[in-house]
Amino acid sequence: MNLNKNNFLNYSILIPYLILAGIGIVMVFSTTVPDQLQKGLNPYKLVINQTAFELLSLIMIAVIYRLKLRALKNRKMIGTIMVILILSLIFCRIMPSSFALTAPVNGARGWIHIPGIGTVQPAEFAKVFIIWYLASVFSTKQEEIEKRDINEIFKGKTLFQKLFGGWRLPVVAILLVDLIMPDLGNTLIIAAVALIMIGASGISWRWYSGYSKLILSLMAIFLGFLFIVGGNIIPSFLPITYINKRFEAFVNPFTDLANSGHQLANSYYAIVNGGWTGRGLGNSIQKNGFLPEAQTDFIFPIVVEELGIIGGIIILAILFFLISRMLIVGIRAKSAFNSLIMIGVSGLLLVQVFVNVGGAIGIIPETGVTFPFLSQGGSSFLGLSLGIAFALNISADEKRREVSELSNHYSSSVPTYEND
């Protein structure tokens, strides 16, 4: 039997990814051309850059797919990458604003400017590297987790060691540095992904269910508290006071249309303008200077304005199909490492689309994260494509292992007869 890896490519993951990538190029073209023309710039520059990053992502996927799985399990390599990632995040934050390589973008310090290429945002890769890192850690602790349950996850003699010792230190370091960039959106997503990975690590359901209910309850109480106090709750001495404006917009975007509520109010207008069937591709009104960041954080309202609520639902359905296919592979996986990666990547996509769309329609505060595979942004697309590359590699490995086991089973069960 031919067990060549190419025979086990999971098209139910690859095809939805390619469809979303194609829609993304079309929508980036639609949202960026008017703004580029108004600024007197090359109208095709941003869509060409996005296309280049998508082609680079396809090459990366092809390379990673061909790697043997043991290469992805190399703990020294994973540890080295995590150190480089943390140092790059710190580099972005501590360098002065005047330093050309780390000049702020929209007030945030999370970008590294590479001449001739553009900007790279390390936090976008951190979301996938956290999954990779925790999958490596938890997959080697399965016997200990089975014996000691959650006590193995939060092992330590003191409370400080339980919270910041061992595998938790790199995760906390990334969260803290990313928060003070400031980058609330990616910080929340990384934290959510880490919680998903803990839940998938093998701890008993009663612990994970209990903590999940507690966190969701606290979030609901917090959002309710925002409506009572009006959103202005972050003390001025903290480096994250910018969040107050987002909280104020969440409570009521129409009280300050010129400032804090401008984006969310115009997001509503875009969705209402689109209706069920949309105004037609390229015919959005809000992208013409009314809705800031229409090509990134708020691309989904523009999708609805141009393609309608039906078009938005179809795109979400494609994305949820992709997520479900990866989740199914993760649940069925025989290897703990494979299962953790698949559940982590599918969880990342689910959380990110919820945070993006939830912020755009006002059910949670806006956080500035991109819509997976549609928004303009090379780092975001590359980072999420890295997750898809891992998923395709692991899916092929699981399928090949299953076929090999079946082949061996039938080979050993076939009776042999001696000649009379």
UniProtKB/Swiss-Prot annotation:
PROSITE patterns: FTSW_RODA_SPOVE (PS00428). The lineage of its organism: Bacteria, Bacillati, Bacillota, Bacilli, Lactobacillales. This is Probable peptidoglycan glycosyltransferase FtsW. GO terms for cellular component: cell division site; plasma membrane. The chain crosses the membrane at residues 13-33, 44-64, 81-101, 114-134, 158-178, 179-199, 214-234, 302-322, 341-361, 371-391. Residues 1-12, 65-80, 135-157, 200-213, 323-340, 392-420 are cytoplasmic. Belongs to the SEDS family. FtsW subfamily. It comes from Lactococcus lactis subsp. lactis (strain IL1403). GO terms for molecular function: lipid-linked peptidoglycan transporter activity; peptidoglycan glycosyltransferase activity. Peptidoglycan polymerase that is essential for cell division.
